[in-house]
Amino acid sequence: MPLYFFTAWLQGELAQFHLIWQSLLALVLIGFGALGASQGQWGLLLLLLSFAGLGYTLRQAGRTPDILDAALTKALGADYREQIPAARRAVLQDTISPREWMRPFSMRRDGVEHLADISYGQDARNRLDIYRPAVQGSGLAPVLLQIHGGGWTIGDKTEQGLPLMYHLAQRGWLCVAINYRLSPRHAFPAHIEDTKMAINWIKHNIGTYGGDPRFIAITGGSAGGHLAALAALTPNKAQYQPGFEQADTTLQAAVPFYGVYDWLPEPAAEANHSMHRFLVRHVLQCTPEENQQLWQGGSPAANTDAAAVPMFIVHGAHDSLVWVEEARRFAAKLAATSAAPVAYAELPGAQHAFEVFHSLRTDHTVNAVARFLEWSYARWQSKHAAQ
């Protein structure tokens, strides 16, 4: 990955820590008489400029809750919070705690049980983890399926989505994180086949763990965002369900983060050429000319229709790996075709993978996604009760 990505990612999400150590550095330099020499004066000037940049970064992150709430209000209605039952609204959060975002890599939370490495298929990568309330309620819990990213070639279920999963599990949800077969050893569509296999496993087995198999939402970032969106838009598609073609793989909501949504963008000039070469060499292992159906079928943007589930698409405006323009086009196309609500939030200053660990932006985003999922669950419950 480009050096710029890592620099911008860590600076953007850990700005408060950079401010702290740079402030300490400035005090040390002043204490050693740096202001008495021109080099020290220039160095302190550079630190002041850095302070200004970091302050602007934190200000951008501070806008996150307003941007996310505006996106949800636009898609779901001004009264969307009131559509969530009062008992569930009571456990949601609008604020964030410094105790969390000042400990960015501390993931575990009280009251959450973690069950590891449960098999859902025959391959060594077909393993899943469950995060659930340590003390389970009287009813079955709604389910969230988390798909990790990593360019379809790397990644693990223990590395991503943890702030969201622990947050939801503390509030009565059951979260499932899966591993799946990776390229280049396995070419696409192995990745989506495993995702569908995991959905089928959840439908048949999650009740044993306290989850409700009737309501499954899906999320993921980057390649996981692609797979989450594709799974949500291709329910029961037999070509992605070898050996379980008749299985029900419908989902009830989706929250893809910074996903790849169109493998064959039109016009071709808008294509990310480095991404295209990577897909040809490592993921699909063929060109579009050699297998147009495979490329087209694997693009979420080519599978939008009126039957799509409610979707909350989140992307960073400064994503240097998956361009934000692709998310804009996908959100617009989905909103134009889907009968269900489509919310789209574009976060200023956010890089790729911005919500992997706790930060100001991450924790505000987790709160908003929890509201969307609770709204989706309440909507589903209302429809189910009326049937």
Task: Specify the residue positions occupied by each region the protein language model found.
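Alpha/beta-hydrolase superfamily serine-hydrolase fold, recognizing
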Residues: 1-387
